Amino acid sequence: MKEILKNLVETTTLPEDSYLDQDAEILEIFVEEIEEIFVELNPLLIDWFANPNDPEILTTIRRHFHTLKGSGRMVGAKSAGELAWAVEDSLNRVISGAIPLDMTVQRYTQTVFKIYQYKLYPIFKTVQTTDIDLRPLVLLGQHIQQNRILAPELEQLLELSTTLNAENQITGF
């Protein structure tokens, strides 16, 4: 992680994960739930970029991140749950009118989806420890929720919305 990004996130904390201590069957159910969400969320995100003002699409996307949050917390994937919460809360604020829906919100949502798809899901599926530092993405979400101007280092994370397309791709996390 770049030094300047490390400095930005030094005060951002995430709960400690405990999913490796979870019963294998419960983890398997969690992985299956993620797979189901992927099937629904992938085309929804495409539709949302084409129709950003469709409230039904927005609400459904928010609900999927709500599910990722709750399920992640339940199985002990707490940092991933917090990341999903950052998206859910951002979308809640869009729905309530507290922040505008713009490309930053959409790209952030897409970025987190791809982090789940290409980085977190393979870890959960193979029951591995994660060394991915999700704090920059959570901090990015917090800045979006507060409608703050993004530091260039945080804004650069949004590039993952279009560039992250494979598990083995290096992201800097």
Task: Name these PLM-found stretches.
Residues 1-173:
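Non-catalytic helical tethers at domain boundaries
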